[in-house]
Amino acid sequence: MNARDDTGEATQVRAEDAPPGRGTWRLDLAYEGTAYRGWARQPGHRTVEGLLGEALATILREPVRLSVAGRTDAGVHAWAQVASFVCARRDLRPDRVRLSLNALLPTDIAVTAVSPAAPGFVARRAVSRTYRYRLWLSPVKPVRDRAYVWNVRGAVDTGLLQRAAALLPGRRDFSALTPSAHLYHSYVREVLTAGWRPAAGDDGPPGHAEWAFTITAGSFLHNMVRVAVGTMVDVAQGRMTLEEFAEGMAAGERRRMGQTAPARGLALVAVAY
């Protein structure tokens, strides 16, 4: 099994730097993850990497190896994903490649930009990734946004959500927030920022109350954001205390944390280099 160093990113699976005579290219893309078994190519399953790789091979007439900033899990969305590849051609016409890719890809995947990159650029080497998780705190069903939010039933203390999020920033062992006990060389990560804020729009139905959790880190552990969100909701609904949250984090034990939030509420929203 490959070791990973962020959310689904395998350290032993990496695109090579471009050798002499080959071009390096960057792809910016967005996708709705509902219909996919995540980013990573998996035999027998529909994945974003699988479809994108097939489309690129058709256009370039050669197989390519993709690197990606955030290797999203099944059902997770990405509104600001970055991928890269190297190929024999250095004279690609970016707009034509973008149009051709979008013609071949399904409507829930969109390539927003194709651009030449400096030799040595590899998408997975991002400095930081930002994820956002959306909660719907209303008795009114989120019909329009049902594929992008977690509709939480029952009262939620948003003040406790905010206090729980304040425990996350910093550099420490986050092994309590992943079910993957033997997947990583190190479980130490640095969370740069984390916080909740109301995200209700003026066009919401009566009783509408949407809250969004935004977190930025250099890299993430598998399911780290979803376990954090699920546990914070448990705190906000009285199933565990802030002290138990902090103690579970310090102990590094997944069994002491709360539920795992559904994938549909999570999206990759920014990548920095």
Mark where each language-model region is.
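Structured-RNA-binding interfaces characteristic of tRNA pseudouridine synthases
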Residues: 2-273
